[in-house]
């Protein structure tokens, strides 16, 4: 089992589950989340419904991973909405709660072990839009998924 880095779009993966970080506000407005919203409207709807249920205390979602089944054309595919940040913004601040992202990834890793899933996620998950430190997040991934096959997908030039 290994963590490997691949070049290209995470949606080109043949993994069983694709993880990405989401905020707790019900907004998938940029990055991989926006692509999830466009490719898999049912994932977005279920995400919005969960956020609406927690609208009075959105931070209560932090650390959760919402796993939604979709059909990726070739086989059953799952999308994991990892609640690693409460709010969002584009001002260069850190929005990712590394602890919350870690909790969500631990849950995904447990499911991957149980069902023998291969996992894919964007390279620098929680770091590009969310502002977390990549070295810290990479260590969490290495430890959490030490016995699970994981692909980190890096878009060209990123």
State what each model feature region is.
Residues 1-158:
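Macrodomain-like recognition of ADP-ribose-binding/processing modules
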């Amino acid at each position: 089992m290994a963590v490997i880095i691949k070049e290209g779009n995470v949606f080109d993966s043949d993994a069983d589950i694709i993880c990405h970080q989401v905020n707790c506000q019900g907004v998938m407005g940029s990055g991989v989340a926006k692509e999830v919203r466009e490719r898999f409207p049912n994932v977005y709807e279920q995400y919005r419904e969960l956020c609406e249920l927690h609208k009075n205390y959105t931070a209560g979602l932090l650390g959760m991973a919402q796993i939604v089944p979709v059909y990726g054309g070739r086989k059953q595919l799952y999308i994991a909405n990892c609640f690693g940040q409460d709010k969002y913004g584009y001002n260069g601040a850190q929005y990712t709660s590394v602890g919350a992202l870690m909790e969500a990834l631990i849950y995904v890793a447990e499911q991957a072990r149980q069902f023998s899933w291969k996992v894919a996620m964007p390279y620098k998950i929680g770091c590009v839009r969310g502002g977390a430190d990549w070295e810290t997040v990479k260590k969490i991934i290495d430890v959490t998924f030490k016995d699970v096959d994981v692909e980190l997908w890096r878009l060209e030039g990123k």
